[in-house]
């Protein structure tokens, strides 16, 4: 369980350390959301590609990717079944409708995960902003104190 810290009681170096920690946490959460969005986009594209699988496209010629920049000609033979990469080199054969349902579930799951992370990211941003404001206040206090001491010495 996280403990509560009163940032007004922290000195400038401690505030700097806290700010750096919050920077790292914000970066981690932002990266996590970005990675989830990349995977979600992949699933959305895969689901959308299933729309070309209909009887009118059966037998049509297409380009089959061997790499991201190399293709070979092919024909669309079976428009009712697809192989889905389920990870770690495993593929599962599904009907086009089952594949759409599979991708929809994956997209929904990723959306929920991003929705769980978003509030934490916003909270960390707000905490970082509060720390930065407190740092600014402390710097202003130190500057004013230094100016007052310089005036007294003069």
Swiss-Prot record:
One GO molecular function term? unfolded protein binding
- Record flagged with keyword Methyltransferase: no
As stated in the Swiss-Prot or TrEMBL entry, residues carrying the post-translational modification N-acetylalanine are 2
Annotated keywords: Acetylation, Chaperone, Nucleus, Phosphoprotein
Protein's GO biological process: negative regulation of amyloid fibril formation; negative regulation of canonical Wnt signaling pathway; negative regulation of DNA-templated transcription; protein folding; retina development in camera-type eye
Q: Which InterPro entries match?
A: PFD_alpha_archaea, Prefoldin, Prefoldin_subunit_alpha
Q: Which residues carry this modification: N6-acetyllysine?
A: 42
Q: Which residues form the signal peptide?
A: none
What GO cellular component entries does it have? cytosol; intermediate filament cytoskeleton; nucleus; prefoldin complex
Quaternary structure (record): Heterohexamer of two PFD-alpha type and four PFD-beta type subunits.
Physiological role? Binds specifically to cytosolic chaperonin (c-CPN) and transfers target proteins to it. Binds to nascent polypeptide chain and promotes folding in an environment in which there are many competing pathways for nonnative proteins. Represses the transcriptional activity of MYC.
| Protein name stated in the entry | Prefoldin subunit 5
